[in-house]
A protein has these predicted regions:
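Arg/Lys-rich, alpha-helical DNA-contact motif
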Residues: 100
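Catalytic/regulatory signature loops of cyclic-dinucleotide turnover enzymes
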Residues: 97
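GIY-YIG nuclease catalytic motif and its immediate N-terminal context
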Residues: 2-94, 107, 111-114, 118-121
């Protein structure tokens, strides 16, 4: 049986702390997205946030989740913006939700003037 010295306990604690720090940083390096969905006639806008844009858009398109987007047939992704953290994404989502329809359409027009479904490109 090996005897562990105080020094090796400190080294182990340091290594554990470093591993936890790296894991925490990896979690913070995830990309989060703020997106805007619309319907075929572009009469409805829905603003949302996700960490998996492909999955989330597929959920909207296939009406897998009951609610606003299923009720109003929102199935076209017209705007996507990536954010560095979930906090930034939620703050941006709230900001966009507070905007008028006209301001949201202006934002979309800067990046997607034809209101194409970005998930099909």
């Amino acid at each position: 049986m090996a005897i562990t010295t105080t020094m090796s306990f400190r080294a182990q604690a340091k290594n554990l702390a470093e591993a936890k720090r790296k894991t925490h940083l990896r979690k913070n390096m995830n990309t989060y997205y703020v997106y805007i969905m619309s319907n075929k006639r572009n009469t409805v806008l829905y603003v949302g946030v996700t960490n998996d844009i492909e999955r989330r858009v597929a959920e909207h398109k296939n009406h897998l989740l009951p609610g606003f987007t299923a009720r109003y047939n929102v199935d076209k992704c017209v705007y996507v913006e990536d954010c560095g953290s979930i906090e930034d994404a939620i703050a941006r989502e709230k900001q966009l939700k507070g905007w008028s329809r006209a301001k949201k359409f202006d934002l979309i027009a800067k990046f997607n003037p034809d209101m194409k479904d970005l998930s099909e490109e």
